[in-house]
Amino acid sequence: KFIDLDIPEIQSLEVEEIVEHKAREAFHRVKQPIMVEDTGLYVAAWNGFPGGLIKWVMKTMGVDGLGRILRDYDRTTVVKACVGLCNGREVKIFTGVVEGTVVECPRGISGFGWDPLFQPAGSRRTYAEMAPEEKNAISHRMKALRAMRDFLQQSPEFLDI
């Protein structure tokens, strides 16, 4: 069941730190096992910036601005999704990573956020140019969710409180 919580987000380049904080805070509020998720976009030329701060960068400059500002830099990028699962005692974090590049001009209409800018390695299309099924088959978020699923199949007792 989806629960819409307004949790203040800590500022960190590391998505793992953001997710751990969000998971603990969410559990504190709902008092039941809960899953949270966040993503980061790590640009090699900027030593990993904006990382977990991508939401704030996108709010400030938007898709066009981010593509434009990277014009003269190495556009090699890693995108990372972290899913945090908290049972009140501990937080398990599951990570999915996809390597690729930030394209200069946004392409595509699907997805959200920076999807029109991110082109996975080995693909000629951005996430936003892909059908949802195609993107989901390779996405960083799906990799993290599959890791969580695999963990829960092996350790269902983690959800016992």
Predicted regions and their residues:
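Anionic-ligand binding patches
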Residues: 1-161
